[in-house]
């Protein structure tokens, strides 16, 4: 069952008596039943004579229909051509006595009725044996009538056997009020499968489990999520997908304690200006025309000064006077101030954007490692720590136990675990929605946290029981244990 993921809670109540209760599907998914239980404190129901057994108990049975191989053939008996069938359907919209759909429904109802009568035969036979008289004549009459009725029943059974669905009955478990109140089971019912439950005994049987979906369905949702843009969900600035080249350039640009603009006394300074211009091109963002001209003028001016210095040195064969060096240094300082201004205050400087992104990533990592009270956004999930816990923090791969309440943004509760067995999950293994995988990291035992999860990190465009499509979900979580 590792290929199926639980998505919602399933529950079914089966009362005692000859009542067939179908396994109802509230929405298209597979049902997995994992527990059958009774309430030992409830009053036991009496039998037909008003008696209660010494040890009240209930037996749960599963009844399923076998595959009806001739259903399609039966529907196609009246015509071999699909066109003829369409014409006949148009002529008789409401159907008639020989309508295949009606006859099929009637046969199923008759079969269910027959099954209910069969379940009563056991108790009826015991009552008949107790009320039977010892008179020999009476016995002969009853036998004669019984034979006649049996022959009639056999004839009617032979007539009804053709076309009726077959039922298979299986005993699941027997529960009593002294030792066995509940029984773990593992029954999977696929969508469209005809399955019924019936209980014989004194108490109601409660069946619980989950609606489950195949893992492959999540991959389709992931493909849909790729179509969503950042603007559609209004992601915070800096929380976005980046290429590997961006990460490499960030690591090269950021070294603690190193100034962003470094003074170089050699001729390598002449090569710095083209590099800065190239970085702006790398970011695929254009500077205003005026700023571009300023940069070009500065570069051209610097090159002219360098050429003059070389000419003086070549013609005279002497070192350049100190005054000219001072002028050159002043030119350097002016140029550096101008470049720093463009980098820090330019409307589209890539260095500034990368620095901001890197700082936000550092803040996210710090928030995960050291939880603190307050609201923060981590990878699109809004985390509000209401109470700090103690001990080590949750990391990927940990199995945790917790309580939670799930709500929509309008305050409507769609799921909760407030008592009984706590909810357990292994973090980072795809057992829950992505918003939980992100929001549980960094919690401590005893801590309380509110997660606000956008749709693309929850169920996306898929509607769930009590959860409309594209819903933002709010979870209040209390961590009980880290295993």
Swiss-Prot record:
Entry keyword Chaperone: yes
PROSITE patterns attached to this UniProt entry: FKBP_PPIASE
Biased composition (Acidic residues): 68-93, 151-167, 216-233, 241-256
SUPFAM superfamilies associated with the record: FKBP-like
Enzyme's top EC category: isomerase
Residues in PPIase FKBP-type domain copies: 397-483
EC number of the protein: 5.2.1.8
Description of how the protein assembles with itself and partners: Binds to histones H3 and H4.
Family recorded in the similarity comment: Belongs to the FKBP-type PPIase family. FKBP3/4 subfamily.
Protein name: FK506-binding protein 4
Provenance organism: Chaetomium thermophilum (strain DSM 1495 / CBS 144.50 / IMI 039719) (Thermochaetoides thermophila)
Record gene name: FPR4
């Amino acid at each position: 069952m590792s290929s199926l993921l639980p998505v919602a809670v399933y529950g079914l109540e089966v009362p005692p008596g000859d009542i067939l209760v179908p396994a109802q599907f509230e929405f298209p998914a597979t049902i997995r039943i994992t527990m059958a239980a009774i309430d030992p404190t409830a009053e036991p129901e009496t039998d037909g004579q008003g008696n209660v057994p010494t040890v009240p108990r209930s037996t749960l049975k599963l009844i399923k229909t076998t595959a009806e191989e001739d259903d399609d053939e039966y529907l196609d008996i009246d015509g071999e051509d699909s066109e003829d069938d369409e014409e006949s359907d148009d002529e008789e919209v409401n159907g008639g006595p020989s309508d295949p759909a009606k006859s099929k429904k009637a046969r199923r109802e008759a079969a269910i009725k027959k099954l209910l009568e069969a379940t009563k035969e056991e108790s009826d036979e015991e009552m008949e044996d107790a009320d039977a008289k010892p008179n020999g004549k009476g016995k002969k009459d009853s036998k004669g009538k019984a034979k006649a009725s049996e022959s009639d029943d056999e004839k009617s059974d032979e007539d009804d056997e053709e076309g009726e669905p077959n039922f298979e009955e299986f005993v699941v478990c027997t529960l009593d009020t002294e030792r066995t109140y509940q029984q773990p089971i593992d029954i999977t019912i696929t969508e469209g499968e005809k399955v019924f439950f019936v209980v014989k005994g004194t108490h109601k049987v409660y069946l619980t489990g989950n609606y489950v979906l195949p893992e492959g369905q999540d991959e389709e949702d992931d493909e849909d999520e790729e179509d969503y843009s950042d603007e559609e969900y209004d992601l915070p600035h800096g929380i976005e997908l980046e290429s590997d080249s961006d990460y490499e350039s960030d690591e090269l640009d950021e070294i603690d304690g190193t100034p962003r603009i470094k003074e170089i006394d050699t001729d390598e300074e002449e090569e710095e200006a083209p590099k800065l211009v190239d970085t702006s091109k790398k970011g695929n963002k254009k500077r205003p025309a005026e700023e571009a001209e300023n940069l070009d003028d500065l570069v051209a001016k610097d090159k002219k000064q360098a050429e003059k210095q070389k000419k003086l040195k070549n013609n005279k064969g002497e070192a350049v006077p100190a005054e000219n060096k001072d002028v050159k240094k002043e030119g350097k300082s002016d140029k550096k101030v101008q470049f720093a201004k463009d980098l820090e205050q330019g409307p589209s400087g890539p260095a500034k954007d990368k620095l901001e992104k890197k700082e936000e990533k550092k803040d996210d990592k710090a928030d995960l490692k050291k939880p603190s009270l307050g609201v923060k956004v981590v990878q699109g999930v809004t985390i509000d720590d209401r109470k700090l816990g103690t001990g080590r923090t949750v990391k990927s791969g940990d199995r945790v136990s917790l309580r939670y309440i799930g709500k929509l943004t309008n305050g409507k509760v769609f799921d909760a675990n407030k008592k009984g067995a706590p909810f357990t999950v292994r973090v980072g293994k795809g057992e829950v929605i992505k918003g939980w995988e992100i929001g549980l990291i960094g919690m401590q035992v005893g801590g309380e946290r509110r997660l606000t999860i956008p749709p693309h990190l929850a169920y996306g465009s898929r509607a769930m029981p009590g959860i409309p499509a594209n819903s933002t979900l709010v979870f209040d979580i209390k961590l009980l244990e880290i295993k």
